[in-house]
Every structure is written in C-alpha cells, then in structure tokens.
Amino acid sequence: MRDTDVATSGTSLAGKHILLGISGGIAAVDSVRIARELRRHGATLTVCMTNSAQNIITPLALSWATQGEIITDWDGDMSQLSRFDAVLVCPATRNILACHLHGIISSPLLMALSAARGNNSPIIFAPSMHSDLAEDSITSEITDSLLAQGAHIIWGVEEEGKRKTVEHTQVVAETAHVINSSNERRKSVVITLGATQSPVDDVRYIQNTSS
C-alpha cells in the first residue's frame, strides 16, 4: 500500500464525487482526516479552499490526502461549476454561511455552493465558530434560512467556549446519509428491543419473549 492509499471501510460513498469545501476556521487543520475518511468509504474528492483556509492548512497537504484536484483560486477551468453528488463544507465559518445565503460569489467555493443550490445537489455544512458567534441571533436566522432552502447543517458540541466541528467519522456518516437518502433502492430496517407482539385478530396476538 502506498502512503497516499487508504484502507476501505465501506462502500456507502462508492462512485460519488464530492466537493470538499474548506473555509478559514481553525478546524481546517482536521481536513486531512476528513478527506481520508471520505475516501475510505469510496468517495472521489475535489477540494475547494478559501484564501483564509490556505493560511491554516496547505493545498499540498490536501493534495496528498485526497489524490484529487485542489481549487485554490479563480482559473479558466472553472472546475467548481462541475456537477457534484454533494458539496460538503467543513469547517464552515459564519462568513461562508452568510455569504452563501445571500448569493455572494466572492470565491470559487461560494460559486460552487451557488451552483449546487441551482442544480439541487445536496449541500452539507459543518460549522465551527466561537460560541458567542454561534449563539448570536443572526447566526440562527442564517442557519434557519439555509435549512429552509434544503441545506443540511451538522453542529458539534460546545467545548472550551467554541462550537467545534463533529468527529470526522460522524461528518462522513451524515454525508453518506444525505447523499443516499434519495436512493430508490435504499433499505428501511426496523430494530426492535425486548418482547414484540404481532396481532392475529381483534383478541389474539403472537408474542416473543425477547428479540
């Protein structure tokens, strides 16, 4: 196995092309871990980094982690306009959330988000910010509006006065859930605990003592 390879953990994202957006929160340092976890489940990645994100983690690190294209600035290819199976922004700063909500396109990442909204591709945000910013009523208005537009937002727990991003495994699990939720061949599973009853008629039933 080469240093850039990853061990397969599942196939829930097999054949899926995901745009991983990275904005300028300090949680960008975890981007390598998230990228490799996405690949472990079969995803192909294109990365789009804001200028602020590049001050925290280098494009070289993401190139190693993803083995995919890294978009760092405007260019003639405009790869950010490609059709993706989902756009995952992790971490998502409040600035990115607000700019996307209001249709501001000041970076390739914001253009990718607007294009995804236009073609109804799934958009997933994993915010990271200081607790005071997260609890600001304007932040709630922004996130409520994005949710109403169909975006998905994964909030982490509060620690050390900050709303940190959730664990990388949970980010990937939520992403796979969102992408596969419209799959017509998706299975619905019922898990029961303890005894269960199944009616035979109005007065009789069959019951097992445990599951």
Kindly give the residue locations of the regions a language model identified.
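A cross-family phosphate/adenosyl-ligand binding-site feature
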Residues: 1-211
